[in-house]
Amino acid sequence: MSSVLAAYEQFLQTTEDRGFGDQQFVQSDTLKAEIPVFVLNTNDPQQRFTLMNFCLRQAVSSSAKSAIKQGALLSLLSLQATSMQNHLMIAARAPDAALRIIEVDAIDPPDYTLTINPRSGWDDIKIRAYRALSRDLPISLADRTVFVSRDAEHAVCDDMDTYLNRIFSVLIQVWIMVCKCMTAYDQPTGSEERRLAKYKQQGRMLERYQLQTDARKIIQLVIRESMVIRQFLVQEMLTADKVGAYTNRYYAMVGDIAKYIANVGMSAFFLTLKFGLGNRWKPLALAAFSGELVKLKSLMSLYRRLGDRSRYLALLESPELMEFAPANYPLLFSYAMGVGSVQDPLIRNYQFGRNFLNTSYFQYGVETAMKHQGTVDPKFASELGITDEDRVDIMQSVEKHISGKAGDDISQPRSAFTMSLNRSAFITNNNPQDLSGARLSNYEQGWSGIDQDETRDTLPESTMHRFQNIDSTNSDHNELQMPEFENDINPFNHPRFTARAPLIPEISHQTPTIRMNRNVNIRDSTRDDRQDANEDRSSNIPDDILGDLDN
């Protein structure tokens, strides 16, 4: 039997192995679109700054074709190099690249009229056409410029230090748009603004040369559509990673942003390793996990064999990326997401509510994480010399502060209640259809499918003590026990509690006979008060008015 299991493990590794560089297989050339790129033959800062603005306008132009926008971005990414043409040779090695080098002798700042070297073979018609493209900006851009500041485009640039600050401010924004270009480009997450604020604080980006939001989105779509640009960017990130700590300003910036781009599209795989295998808890010994553990082992071997490019599989559109999809290990993925929802408050930003999410193993992961929040690793404790008394003290301290809290509750300030309420305890009877079409939260999707009668059996032990005072037949008593939630279509939001007026004691604790007699007395007294009020009102009417009515 052991030989069969070993053969199965080898079989999985063989199915994921791929041989690269085999001389027997040569890919056929495909048709390519010609990409015009501009190369400036001078290092004059004013000329380079003007070409930078010209390339930005070409990249966001409403009339420019895709190849023209791609060439403008490649030219923009090479404006920091001493020799632009040598730097563009990195992009020329791409299989789909058909670059046409356009040598520019000079460019006029006011209207972006190009002076093309005769070797490029351009006539006045193309020069006028590109000048018209640079003027045709989208109507969504304010002040007819790509920058937030309206006067930034036509500022004087007479020294190299000023030019470098401006070109790096623009390039760092282009690199920021690479982070989400292949995964969640149409989902605003706020990460873009946080990274812009980070580089402003570090002094790497000038706020005056911040691009407008619509301009950045257009640039992101150009990067998403172009394999040539993405292969060029991957090569730049690999270069920044290999040069080490002592590097120039540009590659230091690229190496920093590359940390955000690495392993994009593989979050499910790494989160499963972190929360599923990293804790080394006993549930990994389940027989249901045995097959998926072998799969994860083969995937880790595949990741190492792919080398440096394994971090950028999404940018390169590599077919190996499909091997790391969580559908290949659904049970371990569901269990890991349950553990992560308790341990990491930021896991709620990750959309793990997939069709293959197993709610039973998700709930089991939640219970396992809650059970182990106060435990101590025996091996590491022995290395630190922790005694049994210290271990008990540590477990009690942890249990005191975070026991019974979900991952979202740990990061929030303490409320007016002595104990924070776990959202998993307040599961309503509402069906998913009752939420007016709103998407269920990750945590609610994980707890979906549980009947109200089964809630007490499936919830973790740390939350069960909250139901001990609710089992009462008195409806008034039940209303006093539970706080009233504000109306919110998303039950996963943090509950805010409103003060509930107490019931009147003399009404709620009287017998029906006493209540009926009390109501009769109230009606009689009310009728007498109305009669007295009518008599007083009639006595206050003036006599002349009564006389006129009699006549």
UniProtKB/Swiss-Prot annotation:
Quaternary state and interactors: Homomultimer; forms the nucleocapsid. Binds to the viral genomic RNA. N0 interacts with the phosphoprotein (via N-terminus); this interaction allows P to chaperon N0 to avoid N polymerization before encapsidation. Interacts as N-RNA template with the phosphoprotein (via C-terminus); this interaction positions the polymerase on the template.
Keyword flag Transferase: no
Chain positions covered by the region annotation Ncore: 1-404
GO molecular function per UniProt: RNA binding; structural molecule activity
Role noted for this protein: Forms the helical nucleocapsid (NC), protecting the genome from nucleases. The encapsidated genomic RNA serves as template for transcription and replication; encapsidation by N is coupled to RNA synthesis. Forms the encapsidation complex with the phosphoprotein protein P. Before encapsidation, the newly synthesized free N protein, so-called N0, is chaperoned by P.
Keyword Ribonucleoprotein: yes
Major localization listed first in the record, in broad terms: virion
Keywords for the protein's UniProt record, in alphabetical order: Capsid protein, Helical capsid protein, Host cytoplasm, Ribonucleoprotein, RNA-binding, Viral nucleoprotein, Virion
Any one GO CC term of the record: helical viral capsid
Assigned protein family: Belongs to the paramyxoviruses nucleocapsid family.
Disulfide-bonded cysteines: none
Region of interest: Disordered: 508-551
Annotated protein name in UniProt: Nucleoprotein
Regions of compositional bias (Basic and acidic residues) in chain numbering: 524-538
